[in-house]
Amino acid sequence: MSISRVFGVGLFLISPFVFAELPSTNSSVERKIDAQQQKQQAEQDAAILAQQTQSPHVRLEGEKEASLSFPQNEAQCFPINQLVLTDYQAEEEKNSSASSLKLIQPSQFSWALKSVYAERDFALPACIGSEGINVLLRRIQNRLIDFGYVTTRVVVEPQDLRSGMLVLTVIPGKVGRIQLQDQSAIPFATRGTLWFAMPMTQGDMLNIRNIEQGLENLKRVSSAEADVQLSPSEAIGETDVVISYKQRFPFHLTLGLDDSGSKATGRLQGSATFSWDNVLTLNDLFYISGTRSFKRGSDNAEGDYGSKNVSLYYSIPWKNYLLTLSGSKYTYHQTVAGGLESYTYSGESQQMKANLSRL
């Protein structure tokens, strides 16, 4: 899932300092060098971030039934001029309320009724029999599944169709117990691991999209794996969510050497990154990285030159949100030959950033 799909709120601070032992007439050269180094710093930070973080995409699909055409001219049918979708009520709830059809409460899923007209082969009033009712149920059920309500069911309860009203009943599927089974060699998971990851609690409406988001949060660190199993609960309409979780060794050290630098401050770049997965057992990530340039003969630069970059990063997901904190410090120096003497350019850039995004 793209990590920041809806909105992002952030604080960003850049503090660049550039120094040069040269006349002010060379300020354009100074600005050019500084711009090159700022670009190089941004590229280095982006490369490290992409290497150390991941944005897992989890997609779970519910089983839909094939859609059928609405039958015409059924042998046994009832004239229906009103179609109503209502939520299921237990017997005690029914007995405590009036039995008049006028008091039927529309379902919270009434928007799904639009699906019965999608094929344009059905309109009210209509003569509807058992086959037609099954087609209507299937269309509404598939619509609910499309929106993630994979355990919500649509049924027909006993009723008198001579009234001209057909009432379809929705049995909302709710979340039962949420369990996390830690299968790691050394248990890493805590209550916070699950609570920070899952954007739902027991008793909420079960929507597969929330489960997908929870799995993505659990798998946000590279050393963690997670899978889910839905199982019937003892309570009517509830489904237990059982998550299998496994985390490997949480510490990583990455060394690198490439030629991504500039000729002015050194093409050859060496880097070292240390990362720690699940620092607070909240699916969070921390890393620190350092990069510096090394001299080589093909740089086409004379005198003293070089660059260094140190960056810190921390991220923590919380249900449907992601908080990231980052900072970096970049320094460089370069000697440029003048007409009579050489000049030394040096610069320093510091960045601090905080961002809160909705996933």
Locate the predicted segments by residue.
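Immediate N-terminus of the mature polypeptide
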Residues: S2-I3, F19-E212, E216-L359
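Sec-dependent signal peptide recognition
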Residues: S2-F12
